[in-house]
């Protein structure tokens, strides 16, 4: 196991408040055992998400001071537009305040009721935005993605045979576009190979159907291609990114991930008619096309972050730090999804807590226990987030994977803090039988994991109060 060395120095620090187990237990009760409802100041190591939680560089902070807050024609927009075009290569660049608005603008424009949108695996907001248009969000990732022990290098690949079967069954007129999520967040942060993307493009050209990328972790995906795919080891990540996006017709992007910013996103595409319709809607719901719901200073920080994220020293450390956590857990026998992903380590809750059935939310129970005992906040990626109700029987259809995602913010935590996370999980695993399941007491009609509330089925106990 290689100890990853940080390619940066720390200039500004933020104190972290330590809490006791008793405090955290009270906070969990008040939050209905939903970690989204726990105040961030009461979290010691926050691995809920890597979205919008990264540390910006001094270069990005300097860019904030150059913000041009003109309503129309901000110079920061033109800089941002040039950077996006230089990396992604698409004709139209439409800024949004974050990725889900880019999804909303795209799907509300091109997706109609009764249509279907294939993807390797949709993430939560992507799926919700498709279904909000009364369309079907189809997950067509390769079957190996659902085997947490399978160590294929590109487990995010779309199943081309199933994609072709879907097109023939539904008809190309019912498929306005195909999405490809890079990296595949809901499948463990797994990358998609260039060969799979190229072959997807060739398949779709026969109909023709547009290909769009959910590009929020594009740099990490391209780094995996450089590491793992023959023929790319000597190519710069920027060159790999340009080739990857050349096979698509557009992309949505939450820049809160690989844009290294706290807010911002964009939609970029080639189709003139779609771009005009989307821009008209943008003006109605987000703002003028040269700011898209963002301040000029945020556009500047985003432009600079998109350049910085392609630095290979940074990417080597970024992927290496995530791998470091995963390898510490794996060596101790903690069940995780393999291979280790690009932005997060995923605990396999089915194997961690085999005594808790999926109907009692084992991944959520594990996330609750990790926060209660150690002040570490992860997020459930399982029955709560992706469970469905069968419209005929009314029974819950459980997802194949039941995981807790530990998403590591970029350039935020030291390796000592990552080691603390590993040691805490290892200790919790040794007394995992003390963790009990949860019962749902409230759920919203969509994206329920953000606001759901639970009751514990039995009081959870700890070997000793832990203050962190």
Question: Language model features by range: what are they?
Answer:
Residues 2-33, 37-39, 43-55, 60, ...:
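Conserved PLP-enzyme active-site core in the AAT-like
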Residues 67, 252, 405-409:
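Short glycine-rich or small-residue beta-strand-to-loop segments that form or flank ligand, phosphate
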Residues 263, 343, 402-406:
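Short amphipathic alpha-helical segments
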Residues 269, 347-350, 408-410:
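Short beta-strand-to-loop capping motifs
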Residues 275-276, 354-362, 411-420:
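Short, conserved charged micro-motifs
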Residues 285-287, 374-376, 425-433:
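A common structural junction motif
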Residues 290-368, 372-400, 436-446, 467:
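Conserved small-domain helix->loop->beta segment predominantly found in fold-type I
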Residues 385-468:
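PLP-dependent enzyme catalytic core of the Aspartate aminotransferase-like
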């Amino acid at each position: 196991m290689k100890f990853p060395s940080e390619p940066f120095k720390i200039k500004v620090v933020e104190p972290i408040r330590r809490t006791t187990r008793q405090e955290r237990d009270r906070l969990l009760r008040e939050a209905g055992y939903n970690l989204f409802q726990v105040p961030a100041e009461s979290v010691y190591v926050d691995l809920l998400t890597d979205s919008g939680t990264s540390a910006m560089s001094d270069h990005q902070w300097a860019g904030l001071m150059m913000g041009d807050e003109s309503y129309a024609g901000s110079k920061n927009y033109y800089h941002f537009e040039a950077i996006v075009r230089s990396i992604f290569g698409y004709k139209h660049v439409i800024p949004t305040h974050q990725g889900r608005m880019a999804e909303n603008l795209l799907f509300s424009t091109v997706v109609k009721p009764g249509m279907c949108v294939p993807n390797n695996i949709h993430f939560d907001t992507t799926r919700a935005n498709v279904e909000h248009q009364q369309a079907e969000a189809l997950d067509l990732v390769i079957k190996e993605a659902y085997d947490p022990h399978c160590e294929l290098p590109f487990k995010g690949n779309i199943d081309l045979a199933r994609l072709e079967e879907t097109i023939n069954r539904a008809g190309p007129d019912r498929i306005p576009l195909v999405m490809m999520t890079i990296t595949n967040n809901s499948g463990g942060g797994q990358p998609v190979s260039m060969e799979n993307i190229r072959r997807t493009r060739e398949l779709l050209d026969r109909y023709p159907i547009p290909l769009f990328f959910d590009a929020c972790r594009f740099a990490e995906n391209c780094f995996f291609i450089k590491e793992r795919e023959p023929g790319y080891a000597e190519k710069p990540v920027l060159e790999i990114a340009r080739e990857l996006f050349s096979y698509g017709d557009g992309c949505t992007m939450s820049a809160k991930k690989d844009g290294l910013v706290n807010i911002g996103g964009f939609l970029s595409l080639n189709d003139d008619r779609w771009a005009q319709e989307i821009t008209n809607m943008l003006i109605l719901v987000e703002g003028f096309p040269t700011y898209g719901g963002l301040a000029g200073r945020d556009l500047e920080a985003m432009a600079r972050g998109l350049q910085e994220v392609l630095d290979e020293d940074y990417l080597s450390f970024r992927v290496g730090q995530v791998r470091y956590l995963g390898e510490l857990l794996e060596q101790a026998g903690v069940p995780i999804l393999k291979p280790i992903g690009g932005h997060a380590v995923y605990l396999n809750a089915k194997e961690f807590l085999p005594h808790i059935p999926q109907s009692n939310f084992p991944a959520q129970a594990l996330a609750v226990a990790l926060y209660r005992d150690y002040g570490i906040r992860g997020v459930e990626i399982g029955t709560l987030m992706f469970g469905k109700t069968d419209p005929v029987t009314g029974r819950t259809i459980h997802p194949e994977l039941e995981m807790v995602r530990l998403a590591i913010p970029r350039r935020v935590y030291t390796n000592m803090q990552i080691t603390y996370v590993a040691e805490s999980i290892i200790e919790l695993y040794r007394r995992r039988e003390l963790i009990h399941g949860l019962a749902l007491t409230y759920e919203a009609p969509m994206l329920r994991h953000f606001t759901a509330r639970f009751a514990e089925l039995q009081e959870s106990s700890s070997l000793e109060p832990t203050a962190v």
